[in-house]
A protein has these predicted regions:
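Gly/Ser/Thr/Pro-rich low-complexity, intrinsically disordered segments
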Residues: 13-245
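Classical Sec-dependent N-terminal signal peptides that target proteins to the secretory pathway
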Residues: 1-19
Length: 245
């Protein structure tokens, strides 16, 4: 009985302690540092993983992996990342297995899969897709960065962020904050440029950042705010995930 009680308490307290650690860094300019050089941490079939002091970087070859969008947290996938807000309903277009789950909104950009083609682009998405996830923010369009977005007040706030894009070879790239990687939108867009992204969109950052990777001997994950923390804070659960398999 004591062991059961200890286990239950541990399962409740540990995620909250993790949240406290994650957010003790939040908006603290003293911990913000320029992004250093990325190092290759893992290379598998169709994927390379690089890490630096602010970001984890996942580069996928679309000829060797498959992509999708799920309205619930995926299991058994190589990689997944939350791609929407913590609302009861998703914001923007969401398509899962060819079924539209949420309507598109104006502006922003899209990650989508149509047949054997996976794409990331600003502004438009085909009417008929197998999978799609929309964001209200775009960061890089045909190699040009969104300087107007970078100048906005919210863009200068230090928080956990991400950018999803493709390079000139068609590889799909996920750049996501790791533990302590509180950055501005300018920081994450510039990292996208360094990694060769020519089309890139930004999905919700801050408490929304959540991802997991597992392939071969290498695994890593990061959740900016645990499920317990979301419940206490009044946030809903994520409604949309992009995944790779």
């Amino acid at each position: 009985m004591k062991y059961l009680l200890f286990t239950l308490v541990s399962l409740t307290i540990y995620p909250l302690l993790s949240d406290l650690t994650n957010w003790s860094l939040y908006n603290h300019k003293v911990v913000h540092s320029n992004t250093n050089r990325s190092k290759l941490k893992y290379e598998g079939d169709g994927v390379k993983v690089y890490v630096n002091n602010n970001f984890d970087i996942y580069i996928f070859n679309p000829n060797k992996v498959t992509f999708g969008v799920s309205s619930s947290r995926p299991s058994g996938k190589k990689f997944y990342m939350n791609s929407n807000f913590f609302n009861k309903r998703a914001i923007g277009l969401v398509v899962e297995n060819g079924v539209q789950k949420s309507r598109r909104v104006s502006g922003g950009g899209y990650f989508y899969v149509s047949g054997n083609q996976v794409n990331v682009q600003r502004g438009s998405c085909p009417q008929n897709t197998d999978y799609a996830s929309q964001t209200i923010l775009w960061g890089i369009d045909n190699g040009v960065t969104n300087k107007s977005l970078m100048r906005q007040r919210h863009a200068k706030q230090l928080t956990y962020r991400n950018i999803v894009g493709k390079n000139k070879n068609g590889d799909i790239i996920f750049i996501v904050s790791n533990f302590g990687g509180v950055v501005t939108i300018k920081d994450v867009i510039e990292e996208g440029v360094r990694q060769g992204i020519v089309e890139g969109v930004l999905f919700d950052g801050g408490t929304s950042v959540e991802y997991k990777f597992k392939d071969g001997w290498y695994s890593t994950s990061f959740t900016a705010l645990s499920d317990a923390g979301k419940k206490i804070s009044g946030f809903g659960k994520p409604t949309t995930y992009i995944y790779v398999n």
